[in-house]
């Protein structure tokens, strides 16, 4: 049996209004980006302040800075328990989480601002769905998609393709890790193996660098997923399971965190959900008879992916 794995990079979403890496800082500096959102304004000011005060970068050079040169020093200090400038190691952890959300908000803003044609994304999703749903007939696993993109354009397109096909049995977008639905009564977000066990099918979408619709509880490690409706990335939300099971109020120990791996030479792959994604990506690549790269340039900071492909 032949199996194709498609590997998508930032270039895949570019025509639909997405950002490639060297455009993210420029977008953050856009005057209309914050839209009077106090959380975004605070995060943006902290980001600019870090470039100026801690990294000693001149204002006219902001847009030419590589993201790896910003996040690698932060990660080095966090790992070693060191301070940098005004920030303690603990303060850097909080700052990094704030920058995580800021990057995601910048990507989201770009899609809303540009609103370019995304028909090609829908067409590709329909094609992937047609191949994947053949599994209901013969049980063969023919296709998987691996991506380094944070955006959810393709995720939503896959879900629409599944729903438009009106499958009689449970069929899902499968992130190949353990997920919980954002809404308690959302039955469309289920594990891929459960769908296959029920006689349906799954479309494997392995997001190596996390996703804008993934939010994780630091206590129970559950990862919440939501489709269709934009989640305000900077807004506080809390784990409903921990609140129920432990009788907890809205406290930081169960505050949901964005799950994005930012460009850095010191990526932390110890997160239990990210580990599962990478492990399953390695399995998919080992089973592939063909690997198709779309819009991915294998940047130097992605040396872990070079190892994955070896």
Q: Which functions belong to the PLM regions below?
A:
Residues 21-30, 162-163, 223-229:
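Amphipathic alpha-helical scaffolding segments
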């Amino acid at each position: 049996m032949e199996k194709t794995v498609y590997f998508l990079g930032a270039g895949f979403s570019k025509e639909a209004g997405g950002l490639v890496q060297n455009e993210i800082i420029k977008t953050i500096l856009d005057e209309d980006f914050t839209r009077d959102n106090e959380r975004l304004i605070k995060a943006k000011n902290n980001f600019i302040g870090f470039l100026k005060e801690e990294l000693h970068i001149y204002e006219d050079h902001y847009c030419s800075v590589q993201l790896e040169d910003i996040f690698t020093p932060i990660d080095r200090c966090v790992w070693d328990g060191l301070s940098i400038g005004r920030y303690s190691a603990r303060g850097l952890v909080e700052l990094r989480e704030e920058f995580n959300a800021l990057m995601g908000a910048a990507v989201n803003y770009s899609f809303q601002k540009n609103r370019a044609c995304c028909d090609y994304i829908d067409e590709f999703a329909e094609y992937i769905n047609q191949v994947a749903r053949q599994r209901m007939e013969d049980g063969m696993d023919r296709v998987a998609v691996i991506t380094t993109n944070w955006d959810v354009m393709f995720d939503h397109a896959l879900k629409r393709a599944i729903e438009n096909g009106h499958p009689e049995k449970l069929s899902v977008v499968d992130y190949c890790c353990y997920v919980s639905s954002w809404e308690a009564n959302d039955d469309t977000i289920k594990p891929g193996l459960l769908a296959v066990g029920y006689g349906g099918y799954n479309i494997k979408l392995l997001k190596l660098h996390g996703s804008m619709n993934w939010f994780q509880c630091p206590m129970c490690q559950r990862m919440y997923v939501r489709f269709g409706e934009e989640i305000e990335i900077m807004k506080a939300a809390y784990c409903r399971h921990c609140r129920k099971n432990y009788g907890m109020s809205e406290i930081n120990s169960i505050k949901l965190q964005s799950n994005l791996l930012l460009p850095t030479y010191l990526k932390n792959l110890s997160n239990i959900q990210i580990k599962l994604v990478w492990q399953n990506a390695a399995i998919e690549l080992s089973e592939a008879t063909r690997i198709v790269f779309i819009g991915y340039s294998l940047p130097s900071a992605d040396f872990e992916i070079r190892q994955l492909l070896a």
